[in-house]
Regions:
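Pepsin/retropepsin-fold aspartyl endopeptidases
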Residues: 1-141
Length: 141
């Protein structure tokens, strides 16, 4: 089946207890990126990472704290040309009726409208509309 997504969509990251995030599709990015602050490694050999996120783009006072196993560390060059080392985690993403495990880099996106961008690796199997947003419904909480 072909699944359609718009240039912006509601997604959920259930393994991180994030039921609804406004995200922008970005075919210029290979890997998805998630806004994170207070990023800290922990555990034996620092194999885990914990971080905070403000999932509501209009309310920075509301924070959710998450943790995940570190999949990788990558040097990522953002659209403004600045390179930074980022932790990569793997977690389940839900868009509409589609659930899939995707890699996500953690970075500070506090000045960005979208707390998450959905990169090409997560968009495999989707048709993207550059003209429409919200093909999928708001996630069921």
């Amino acid at each position: 089946p072909i699944y359609y997504v718009g240039w912006e969509e509601w997604v959920s990251l259930p393994e991180l207890n994030l039921p609804a995030l406004l995200a922008k599709t970005d075919t210029g990015a290979e890997t998805s990126a998630l806004h994170a602050f207070n990023i800290q490694t922990f555990g034996k050999n620092n194999e885990m990472v914990r971080f905070g996120i403000n999932p509501i783009d209009t309310d920075e006072r509301f924070s959710v704290f998450c943790s995940s196993k570190i999949l990788d560390q990558r040097n990522v060059t953002s659209s403004n040309g600045i390179s930074e080392m980022r932790y990569v985690i793997e977690t389940e993403m839900t868009i509409g009726n589609v659930r899939k495990k995707i890699p996500i880099t953690l970075t500070n996106r506090e000045n960005m409208k979208y707390k998450m961008i959905i990169g090409r690796s997560a968009l495999e199997g989707f048709q993207i509309s550059a003209e429409k947003s919200f093909f999928t419904e708001y996630p069921q909480l």
